[in-house]
């Protein structure tokens, strides 16, 4: 399933009844968030606000408001098919040579997909149909949403920030929120470990005092947007991965004012620079934790050019206590993570990041346990294998007879198979999400691993309990006569 641009995807969603056009005048200040939040919690459609109060530019919200829409954006029909995306990423992360002639042909589809990885550079692009520069640059023309009553200012949320380190061949795409503080200025809130911040740090070391080029694309095609939030290998660019998802090369164009390349079909592109040493206090903002975060200084992004499509659409979202759009993305991307982890740890049966745990702060892993201490190895592996789990505070490891996605099962395993002193692992002074105000130091805190597996010799000296199992023959006999018994008329035979 191929979408050339965001508008193709909008058209498909509308055909499927997955997009609602809102013709009434709605204020980007708080009102859009209220409508989007109610719609998302009800599993409703994407929303296109055609008449934002005080603006002529429509606003697109809740684009990825259900896991199935995330899957559609990745070119798949349902969430389960995202396991195939994960298998492709696992293959790209650690490709293996064919083990024989048959294996060569089995892997041929994966190798053919690699042909779509290089970008296609255009000279003329839709995203540059209109160009604003100098005094004409005015961010207040864009209907940037203010999401929560205590937010400091309107906030750009879905911008794909494009950077390149001075010694890197490939660009980095990252999504960092940006507070509007003037007609041509935003605050770039990127954390120190993120790709954009690392590129900036390297730039400042090699080009002290020089301006760092930055571009931000808004309203790219869904494959490019989702490529920026997917755990692609460090050696693979987000544009290359988007080409794999789309099945066609990602079309890019050189920016008007710098050498960065942006998605050619993007609705809006902000071009400019960060002046080393220029910072401003960012926040507070309501975020995905359900709280307002503290104020801190971040670099100022000065916009020198705005390029856009004719009749541009502004793509936006809000973040708050789950469920929100990032939590929905987390549910879908969970399926991508599983094959990647299984490639490194074949003993993993399932891996689950509950959305109520902010989609990354708590993980439940089920394994085919093979030896004493196995659960602890898996805990350490989860924390260290992918940088996406650097901020996962709690890892619960269970046996494969437990459903990782059923809290009844998980709580049963914790309360019957764990001794708190023996089976709890605490690791101090580890990287923690900057937004986690529960940590004693900003960005540094502890992690907890919980071994809720059955204990093997060497882990306990006691006789271990045997789970109760029903007799299958008895269950089958009662199933056959259950309806005749008429005990619970609405309850079918199991």
Swiss-Prot record:
It is found in: Cell membrane. Its EC number is 4.1.1.98. One of its GO terms (biological process) is ubiquinone biosynthetic process. GO terms for cellular component: cytosol; plasma membrane. Binds 1 prenylated FMN per subunit. It catalyses: a 4-hydroxy-3-(all-trans-polyprenyl)benzoate + H(+) = a 2-(all-trans-polyprenyl)phenol + CO2. It is a peripheral membrane protein. Mn(2+) binds at residues 172, 238. It comes from the Bacteria. One of its GO terms (molecular function) is 3-octaprenyl-4-hydroxybenzoate carboxy-lyase activity. Pathway: Cofactor biosynthesis; ubiquinone biosynthesis. It holds the Pfam family UbiD_C. Transmembrane segments: none annotated. Its cofactor is prenylated FMN; Mn(2+). The active site is at 287 (proton donor). Catalyzes the decarboxylation of 3-octaprenyl-4-hydroxy benzoate to 2-octaprenylphenol, an intermediate step in ubiquinone biosynthesis. Homohexamer. This is 3-octaprenyl-4-hydroxybenzoate carboxy-lyase. It comes from Erwinia tasmaniensis (strain DSM 17950 / CFBP 7177 / CIP 109463 / NCPPB 4357 / Et1/99). The lineage of its organism: Bacteria, Pseudomonadati, Pseudomonadota, Gammaproteobacteria, Enterobacterales. The gene is ubiD.
């Amino acid at each position: 399933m191929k979408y050339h641009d965001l508008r193709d995807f909008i058209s498909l969603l509308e055909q499927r009844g997955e997009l609602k056009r809102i013709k009434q005048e709605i204020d980007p200040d708080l009102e859009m968030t209220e409508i989007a939040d109610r719609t998302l919690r009800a599993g409703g459609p994407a929303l296109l606000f055609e008449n934002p109060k005080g603006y002529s530019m429509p606003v697109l919200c809740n684009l990825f408001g259900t896991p199935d829409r995330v899957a559609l954006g990745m070119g798949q029909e349902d969430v389960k098919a995202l396991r195939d995306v994960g298998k492709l990423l696992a293959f790209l992360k650690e490709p293996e040579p064919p083990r024989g002639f048959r294996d060569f042909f089995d892997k041929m589809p994966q190798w053919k997909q690699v042909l779509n990885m290089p970008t296609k550079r255009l000279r003329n692009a839709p995203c540059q149909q209109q160009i604003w520069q100098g005094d004409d640059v005015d961010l207040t023309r864009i209907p940037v949403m203010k999401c929560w009553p205590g937010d400091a200012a309107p906030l750009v949320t879905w911008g794909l920030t494009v950077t390149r380190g001075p010694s890197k061949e490939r660009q980095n795409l990252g999504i960092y929120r940006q507070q509007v503080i003037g007609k041509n200025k935003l605050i770039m809130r990127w954390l120190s470990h993120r790709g954009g911040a690392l590129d900036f740090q390297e730039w400042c070391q090699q080009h002290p005092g020089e301006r760092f080029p930055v571009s931000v694309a808004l309203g790219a095609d869904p494959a490019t947007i989702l490529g920026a939030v997917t755990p692609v290998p460090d050696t693979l660019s987000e544009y290359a991965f988007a080409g794999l998802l789309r099945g066609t090369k990602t079309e890019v164009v050189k920016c008007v004012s710098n050498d960065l390349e942006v998605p050619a079909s993007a609705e809006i592109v902000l071009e400019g620079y960060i002046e080393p040493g220029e910072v401003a206090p960012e926040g507070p903002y309501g975020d995905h934790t359900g709280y307002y975060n503290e104020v801190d200084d971040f670099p100022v992004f000065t916009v020198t050019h705005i390029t856009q499509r004719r009749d541009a659409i502004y793509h936006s979202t809000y973040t708050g206590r789950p469920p929100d759009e990032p939590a929905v993305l987390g549910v879908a991307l969970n399926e991508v993570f599983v094959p990647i982890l299984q490639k490194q740890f074949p003993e993993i049966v399932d891996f689950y990041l509950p959305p109520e745990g902010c989609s990354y702060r708590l993980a439940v892993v089920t394994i085919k346990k093979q030896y004493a201490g196995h659960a602890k190895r898996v805990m350490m592996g989860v924390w260290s294998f992918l940088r996406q789990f650097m901020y996962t505070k709690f890892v619960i490891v269970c046996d494969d007879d437990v459903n990782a996605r059923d809290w009844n099962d998980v709580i049963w395993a914790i309360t019957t198979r764990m001794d708190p002193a023996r089976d709890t692992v605490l690791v101090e002074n580890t990287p923690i999400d900057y937004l986690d105000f529960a940590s004693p130091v900003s960005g540094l805190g502890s992690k907890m691993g919980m071994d809720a597996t059955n204990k093997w010799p060497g882990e306990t000296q006691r006789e271990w309990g045997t789970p109760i199992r029903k007799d299958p023959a008895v269950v089958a006999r009662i199933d056959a006569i259950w309806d005749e018994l008429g005990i619970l008329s609405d309850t079918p035979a199991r």
